[in-house]
Amino acid sequence: MRYVRLCVISLLATLPLVVYAGPQPLEQIKQSESQLSGRVGMVEMDLANGRTLAAWRADERFPMVSTFKVLLCGAVLARVDAGLEQLDRRIHYRQQDLVDYSPVSEKHLVDGMTIGELCAAAITLSDNSAGNLLLATVGGPAGLTAFLRQIGDNVTRLDRWETALNEALPGDARDTTTPASMAATLRKLLTAQHLSARSQQQLLQWMVDDRVAGPLIRAVLPPGWFIADKTGAGERGARGIVALLGPDGKPERIVVIYLRDTPASMAERNQHIAGIGQR
């Protein structure tokens, strides 16, 4: 697919650096920031070559909220590829291991869940207890952060477990990423040698099967477009989505959008993310 030549715009020091393919994405984001009374971060990246197609506040920190679960399952799959884990290994847990919003894991206190089932629950339904159970297998938040450093992400960090990681305090670097780092790391997981082809396809399929992202970019995509995504939401207006998109049913680009520090309702945040992500 042909893309217009990228433009690099130097703004005043008080404004974020913007790289963009045309005026529409920038104008939509500026309008959203004004209406939300908060901050928006966005990166659109070519999946094949890693070129940045559009960006706004690309290097500013935003709470990952539940978008971290894609990275977590990437770390789990890396352990599977290394022979250190098996997707069919069953984990048993107790009532006291459950945290708020565990729609799948709360139903399996008797029989437990496999690693693969936990990843599916964590990504497709954002099950928080599934996320914590998986975090324990990779060494907790510090273990996931170490994995990210190993694959070249020196920015993204996870410091806490669900649900404390959704606190999203202003100025707090804990449990944050930047849009640029998240996009680059997701691309590494899906295209580089950090995961086997089989694991890459599995991670992508879990994102394709996402069942809680309907009101966001999925709501505004043209017919026939591919989408695989993972959303997140937290306190103080935190909201986010990481997605792969493309026409003709093929993933061609990565889109990362984060919001923070806004008093807007969930419905309003969803609407703005959909508007920014609209093709």
From Swiss-Prot:
Signal sequence segment: 1-21
Active site: 66
Other remarks in the entry: The class A beta-lactamase family has a specific amino-acid numbering system, sometimes called Ambler or ABL numbering and often misspelt as Amber. A multiple sequence alignment was used to derive a consensus sequence and then the consensus was numbered taking into account insertions and deletions. This allows use of identical numbers, e.g. for active site residues, despite differences in protein length. UniProt always uses natural numbering of residues, hence there appear to be differences in numbering between this entry and some papers.
NCBIfam families (alphabetical): bla_class_A, LEN, SHV_LEN_OKP
Family: Belongs to the class-A beta-lactamase family.
Pfam families per record: Beta-lactamase2
GO biological process, one term: response to antibiotic
Record keywords, A-Z: Antibiotic resistance, Disulfide bond, Hydrolase, Signal
Enzyme class: hydrolase
SUPFAM superfamilies registered for this protein in UniProt: beta-lactamase/transpeptidase-like
Catalysed conversion reaction: a beta-lactam + H2O = a substituted beta-amino acid
Domain of life from the UniProt record: Bacteria
Disulphide linkage map: 73-119
EC number: 3.5.2.6
Species assigned in the record: Klebsiella pneumoniae
MF GO annotations: beta-lactamase activity
Name under which the protein is recorded: Beta-lactamase
